């Protein structure tokens, strides 16, 4: 198991499909905060609970100026069915082919199982990873770490952040 990318690292750009006909690139969000939520699989109980929680907290993410993107190695059709079933209002990106290439670039791929790690990244407006966290695969990491990181980013913009800035949670 490799280490996920640490804060202070430039977030690797990528282009992945949201639907069979629509692709989305991280670079499209230049100048905005982005949350990347890598997860092992649509339909698994923990992943379903995690994505449903993020859907409920989505207004808080957006109020803090952040867009949420979910990423797994599932195909676009699986994502569409999962998003429809869970009534998700954020994009699920398919890291399907080459399998797990984006997860690998972020150090968030479980080679032994062929799925993404349960890993979170908060990326700042300049495309730099501000906060990253890998959760045990069977544990929903919740949203508090993401919200705290976004609040810390806002505090730094206002001159109230800590001197260390970016942080990483293993």
Model-identified regions with their sequence ranges:
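Chalcogenol-based redox active-site neighborhoods
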Residues: 1-170
